[in-house]
């Protein structure tokens, strides 16, 4: 990620994914902070060894673990078992950009069974290589030359809910994540680890928190109106 632009990028994704969802007449919200247990390492500056005129304009850091004031960004928070709700436009028409030789946003969520739109703002050769979770197996491997500004990836690649890792064989430092889901009750933690999921019907649910570096954590929550939920992961 280009230094100085990270907070803005995280805030934009947080706002898009946290749009109000339609629920029952007794729907409330779940909000809180995803906290990091321990001392976070300083972000490393990655080596840019190809297409330096485009990729080397700004320093690129390893954003696999971003912690600010003890809060973890890019954690995906899902509420399991809640009924109703509507997917936001951002989740039904999910877009990822290749800009400055990084995937932007680093983590995004989409409605399972929809297409993923991948932009190429760099106007150089990229290839969109997707993998199931952290496996090295290939789901799709599609070249995106400089003249192809928009790539529409078939919904068959995202038919089932799950975590998809996105890499680029041309630029080996590029990494992104797409989480396909059947529930609209999901959010990505923003700057400082803050998240909010609106429109959640009252009830008892399981909350799943996933982070690319820190793994998965589940916990219970009783929702009644506006409910606070803080969680600590990692360490």
Q: What is the predicted function of each stretch?
A:
Residues 19-27:
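Sec/Tat signal peptide C-region and signal peptidase I cleavage site
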Residues 26-235:
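Extracytoplasmic copper-binding redox domains, predominantly the cupredoxin/blue-copper superfamily
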């Amino acid at each position: 990620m280009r230094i100085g632009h990270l907070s803005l990028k995280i805030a934009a994704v947080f706002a898009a994914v946290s749009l109000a969802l339609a629920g029952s007449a007794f729907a409330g919200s779940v909000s809180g902070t995803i906290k990091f247990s321990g001392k976070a390492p300083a972000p490393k500056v990655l080596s840019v060894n190809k297409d330096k005129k485009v990729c080397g304009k700004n320093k690129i850091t390893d954003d696999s673990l971003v912690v600010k004031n003890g809060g973890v960004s890019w954690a995906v928070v899902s509420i399991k078992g809640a009924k109703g709700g509507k997917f936001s436009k951002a989740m039904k028409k999910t877009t990822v950009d290749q800009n400055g030789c990084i995937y932007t946003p680093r983590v995004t969520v989409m409605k399972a069974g929809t297409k993923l739109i991948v932009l190429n703002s760099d106007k150089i050769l990229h290839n969109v290589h997707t993998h199931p979770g952290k496996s090295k197996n290939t789901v799709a491997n599609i070249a995106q030359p400089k003249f192809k500004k928009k790539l529409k990836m078939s919904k068959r690649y995202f038919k089932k809910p799950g975590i998809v890792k996105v890499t680029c064989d041309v630029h080996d430092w590029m990494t992104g994540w797409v989480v396909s889901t059947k529930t609209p009750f999901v959010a990505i933690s923003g700057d400082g680890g803050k998240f909010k999921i609106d429109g959640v019907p009252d009830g008892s649910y399981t909350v799943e928190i996933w982070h690319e570096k820190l793994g998965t954590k589940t916990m219970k929550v009783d929702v009644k109106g506006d409910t606070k939920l803080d969680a600590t992961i990692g360490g």
